[in-house]
Amino acid sequence: MKFLLVLALCAVVYAKHEAYIGWKSYYVGVATDAQAKALEPLIQKYELDFLSHPTKSREGVVLVKPQHQAGFVQDIEAGGITYRIHADDVKRQLEFDDQLIEMQRMSSFTRTAGRQLPYDNYQELEVIDEYLDYIGEKYPDVATVVNAAESFEGRPIKYIKISTTNFEDENKPVIFIDGGIHAREWISPPSVTWAIHKLVEDVTENDLLEKFDWILLPVVNPDGYKYTFTNERFWRKTRSTNNNPLSQICRGADGNRNFDFVWNSIGTSNSPCSDIYAGTSAFSEVETRVVRDILHEHLARMALYLTMHSFGSMILYPWGHDGSLSQNALGLHTVGVAMASVIQSNALPNFPPYTVGNSALVIGYYIAGSSEDYAHSIGVPLSYTYELPGLSSGWDGFHLPPQYIEQVCRETWEGIVVGARRAGDLFRK
């Protein structure tokens, strides 16, 4: 049995990650705003991929390709920017992570009688889609699966509607939660599927089912999500191409820069090879159009929009493009703090505390075209980005060990419960 386990782990380890041969990751620290600004041109110059951006209060982590490492180090040393090695061999670290995932899979296989659940491990897209179909078939009185569209590569973009009144009661507020806009943020989809589980399979808050209508979209970006399992673990964007010949080499757009609110004005890129490429136009991506259409279809009753990202233990609200505050800033902050407080009371002690605030001010940089800002701009009163927790600013921040997935799902659900009830109170006033 032990021999078979070793063979299984080896098969996982050597199956992928060749794209990251020779890559390293670095901790990067900045002491001044000028140093933070000096990093910006290096992103394009050296094709840097920041897993987390540095601020004056915390280090960031950046991935660097082998051909750029010497130049990158030389430039940041010249600018007085501090750095240290985070992972000397990114490929080897990813192989170790794969072992943890496979061990978790084997452990849960026995616990769940062979059934793969989308919230007890980092599961492939097919497992998530099968779960949605299972819920729709087993609970047809309250759950309806919607195949909203096909992704660029032809995969279904599925979401589930949960309602005791078939979405026909105009007095019920609508809660919309999505995940997986950024393909590599693997903790995001489980947090959404756990919410489905709690609303349908393991109901402990009956009022949430009776008094609200729910829309839950676990994977906005199925093409990108699938690609992170088969090719590049740190892929972030969609997988589309366009008339620009460069897009055949550098595919996709950043879904969270593709929404039509001050689109492509700041914190984005016009280069298809950039991880923050805003696309050829607002809503150029079918994936973001699905989110847009859901928001507009139910806008009159849309009381709360949550988009799940990672990482950082943050609850963020508009406006992210310039750091200004919404007219509803007090309400946004009050509800955000209430959600964060209950999450914190249910969190493990080794998880960092949640921070609540304006997106740009908390994360330390501006972005245009986000789903959070767009939803608020069209009239959704409470619109938030959840940056789900990690164990550190390093590897275990971005790639949370799989044994912590269910814990994150549980505590995040408690925040959703509070947010929904607060949103319902405001909706009914």
Curated annotation (Swiss-Prot):
Q: What is its EC number?
A: 3.4.17.2
The UniProt entry's GO CC annotations, sorted and at most eight, read: extracellular space
Its GO biological process annotations read:
proteolysis
Q: What are the disulphide bonds in this sequence?
A: 250-273
Query: Where can this protein be found?
Result: Secreted
Q: Would I find Disulfide bond among this entry's keywords? A: yes
- Function according to Swiss-Prot or TrEMBL: Metalloprotease which cleaves a single amino acid from the C-terminal end of polypeptide chains. Shows a strong preference for peptides with a terminal lysine residue.
Q: Which residues form the Peptidase M14 domain?
A: 121-423
Group of enzyme by EC: hydrolase
Recorded name of the encoding gene: CPB
According to UniProt, the reaction catalysed is: Preferential release of a C-terminal lysine or arginine amino acid
The protein's matches in CDD domains, at most eight in alphabetical order, are given as: M14_CP_insect
Q: Which family does it belong to?
A: Belongs to the peptidase M14 family.
Is Cell membrane included in the keywords of this UniProt record? no
Q: Say which domain of life the source belongs to.
A: Eukaryota
Binding, substrate: 182-185, 236, 256-257, 310-311, 365
Cofactor(s) the protein requires to work: Zn(2+)
Give the binding site residues for Zn(2+).
Answer: 182, 185, 309
Record's protein name: Carboxypeptidase B
The known regulators of its activity are described as: Highly resistant to inhibition by potato carboxypeptidase inhibitor (PCI). Moderately inhibited by leech carboxypeptidase inhibitor (LCI) and tick carboxypeptidase inhibitor (TCI).
What Gene Ontology molecular function terms does this protein carry?
Answer: metallocarboxypeptidase activity; zinc ion binding
Please state the span of the N-terminal signal peptide per the UniProt entry: 1-15
The positions flagged as active site in the entry are 387
Q: Name the UniProt key words of this record, in alphabetical order.
A: Carboxypeptidase, Disulfide bond, Hydrolase, Metal-binding, Metalloprotease, Protease, Secreted, Signal, Zinc
